[in-house]
Amino acid sequence: MKYALLISAGLLLAASQQQPAQAQSAHELINQAVAAEGGADALRGLKSLAIKAEAMHWEPGQSKAAGGEPRFLGNTSLLVTWDLANGMARTEWDRDMKYPSMERLKFTETVTPSFGYVTDEKGSKAASSIRVAASLRELERASPTLLLKALDAKSGVRPLATEKRDGKNLLAVGFLDGATNFTLLLDPQTKLPVVIRTRDDDNIVGDSNYDLVLSDWKAVGDAKIAHTLSYQLNGVEVGKVTYKEVTANPTIAADAFAMPDAVKAEAKPPATGNVPYQWVIRRIFLGRFLDSDGIIAPPGTGLKLVELAPNVQHVQGGTANNLIVAMKDHLVVFDAPYGELQSRWVFDEAKKKYPGKPIKYLVLTHHHMDHTGGTRTFMAEGATVIVPAPDKAYFEKVARMPHTIVPDELAKKKRAVKVQEVKDQMSFKDDSDEIRLYNITNPHADGMILGHIVKENVVWVTDILSPRGPIERNAGTLAVGEAFKKYGITGSTIAGGHGATAKQADIGPALGMEVTSR
C-alpha cells in the first residue's frame, strides 16, 4: 500500500503547514548547521571527494499492484570522483538489475556546470540538457558544501515552518540556490541536516516532496559527512546510497572531466525552465531513460501515426505507444504514455485524422506510470477511463491529486471524471466495428487488459509482449498465448505498447501455441 499512501500524502501536504518559528533567524540556524558539520573552515577545506558506495533503487510506479509495494530495481556499485570546488563529478555505475529485466548495466556519467556526457561500452555521447540539469541539481542536494552556499548567500535564505518527523520538530530553512528552492530540515538537538527537500512534479502523484534523508554522520578529515543517503518521494524510498569509503581531497587527473573530442559538438548546457526532474531521475534508476531533450522521442525524431487499418492508427516513435481506433461516431484510445506532452499530441493528431469524432474512451492496459502518466489529459477532455480491476479507486485518486507545481489540463479545467473497471470482459460495439477487452492473468501487473479490435483482427498488448526484434518465449508472452487460446484469437496482428507489430502466426513458439490461419 506504499504508493497509495504516497498519493494520500500528496493530498494532505497543503493541509499540514504551520507558521514558521521566529525564535532563531534562518542565518543563525544555518550557522549552527555548518558548525555541526565541522565548521566553515573544515567544509571550505573540502575541495574534492572520492567515494565508493553501494546503492539500491525502487520504483513505486512499477509496483505489481496499483498503489502497492514499490518494485525493487536492483543493486548498484558506485565510484564517484567529485570536484566540489568546481561543481563537477564523474560517477561510474555498475548495476545488477533485477527489473524491468535481469541485466548488467555499466556506464559512467560525467557532469560539469556547462555540459555532461555518458560513456558505456559503445563509447561516449553528450547528455541531454535535461539530464545535465537533473544531475547538477542532485549533486548540489547531496553536496556537503550546500550549507556553505546558504551561509554565504546574501539573500534567498528564509525561515520556514517546523516539521514533525519521527517524533521530532525539525527546524526548517528555505534556501533559493539559483533556480532551485531547497528546504533544509535540521535536527533540533544536533543541528545536523536531516532532510534536503525539493518540491517536484510527478507524472502520477503530481505535487510531491522529493527528499534526501541524511544519516550515519562520520568524520571525513575535519568535516562530517552523512554516509547513508535515502531518496524518498512523499516518504516512499526510491533510492538508498551507502558510502563505504570516502577520501577527502584526492588527487584528480587534469583530464578527469574533459569531454571527448568526438562529442564536443553535441554538448548541451543544463536545461532551464520546466525540467521533468522526477522523470529523468527515476527513469535513470529504472535503467530506461531516453537521453533526449525530446523526452519521449530520440533526438531529431518524433511521434508518428502508422496505419494498421483505415480506422486503426498505431502511435509509434516514442518510448511507449498508443493505439487509436475509430468507431462510427467516436474514438477509443489505448494507453496514455509519459504525460501531457504525448497525450496532447495524440489528441491533436486524432482530430486531424478523424475530424468530428471525439475521444470517448481511454483504455489503460495497466497502472504503470510509463503508460498512464498522460491519463489526466484525457480526463480533462471528458473521456471515460477504462481500467482493469482492481484499479478503479487508484485512478479516481489520481484524478484528485493536486498539480500546482506544473499545472496540467485537468488542474486548469476541473471536471467530473468517470472511471470504469473491467473485471473479466467488456466490449464496445457499433455498426462499424467491435472492440473486446479482456482482463488477463499475467506476471507483470495485477490487472492487465488485452484489447482486440475484431474486424481488423488487431490485438493491443503492452509490456508482456513487445514486438521489437526477435520475440523470446517468457512468462509474459505465454500469458498472451493463453489469452489467445481462451478467447479463440487466431491470425491476428499484434500491436505493441512498445516497439511495432508482429504477426501472431510468426511467433507461435513465443506464445506457446500452434497458430493456424484465421
Question: For each predicted feature, which ranges?
Answer:
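N-terminal mature ectodomain segment of secretory-pathway/periplasmic proteins
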Residues: E28, Q32-A35, A40-S124, A161
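Divalent-metal (often Zn2+) His-rich catalytic cores of metallo-beta-lactamase-fold enzymes
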Residues: G481-R518
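Conserved beta-strand hairpin/beta-sheet module of binuclear metal-dependent hydrolase folds
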Residues: V306-A350, M448-S466
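Flexible, processing/modification-adjacent segments and terminal tails
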Residues: Q24-L29, A35, A42, M102-E103, ...
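Active-site metal-binding motif and surrounding structural segment of the metallo-beta-lactamase
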Residues: L341-I386, E421, E482-T493
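Zn-dependent metallo-beta-lactamase
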Residues: T247-P250, A256-K328, M426
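Gly/Pro-enriched, hydrophobic low-complexity segments
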Residues: D166-A262, H452-V454, V461-T462, P467-K485
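Bacterial N-terminal signal peptides
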Residues: A4-A15
